[in-house]
């Protein structure tokens, strides 16, 4: 049974998760000698995935870890975590970090709602549709989106959005069909992503040649990514796929705020309005979901099993 209390717990988990995830781009920007986007992404998944993997092994034990690891779709989802990072870090220099977030996170929210309907998790509510549309409009204002962008960058960001949507929908399905904790399932996903990223990370780590860069990588992996995914798992466990992806639109808002305080970036009036629009839309969604749980009884919803 998913209660109102559980829904609120899921929302809080996503808020904390988006805080940690929003620091990723800023961490790379303040490095002394940052490596290629692909290398930084690989190190992030390698260390962060290993961190949450060790955490869930300690908390849930080898038996539960192995039970989830034996599920074929889990390996597919593990690969999605790595492919998502590669796609995002490829798109960023092509079309910009902000627009990459707009395309990837915006499309993932729409696709997650669509997949939820197709796979029987319930039709999107009017509040979810309104909140998502308004939030994406706000994100468009925040990023200053324009049409002069490279097609390959757009396609990469859309691919990242597809990976994120499938990850959330199939991840929620795995949690329900296996009756497993969201942190455990997300931890196994990330452990697989860590194994896939390890060769790329270890082969491209020559740029980590200063104490500050080492400390930032250790923050980006074991702290931001590990802790971020622990709280993300709480959101996956308690909320619907569409709501998870829509609430995560907070991530680019957080990245913008970090850019202002740490990188001396300027926020235009249009960008400020965009931030306020996003926050208003997500506040509406969060209030609605905290009052009425998304899933009254997990036994009654559809699964992909």
Segments predicted by a language model, with ranges:
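Hydrophobic transmembrane alpha-helices of multi-pass small-molecule transport proteins
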Residues: 52, 81, 124-144, 164, ...
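Juxtamembrane helix-entry segments on the extracytoplasmic side of multipass membrane proteins
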Residues: 6-11, 34-42, 66-71, 144-163, ...
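Specific transmembrane alpha-helical segments of multi-pass solute transporters/efflux pumps
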Residues: 53-99, 141, 221-239
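Hydrophobic/small/kink-forming positions within alpha-helical transmembrane segments
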Residues: 22, 26, 78, 82-86, ...
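Glycine-/small-residue-enriched transmembrane alpha-helix faces in small-molecule transporters
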Residues: 1-43, 48, 79, 83, ...
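Specific alpha-helical transmembrane segments that line the substrate/conduction pathway
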Residues: 39-50, 89-122, 241-260
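Hydrophobic/aromatic residues within transmembrane alpha-helices
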Residues: 30-31, 40, 44, 91-92, ...
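C-terminal-most transmembrane helix of multi-pass membrane proteins
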Residues: 2-3, 45, 49, 213, ...
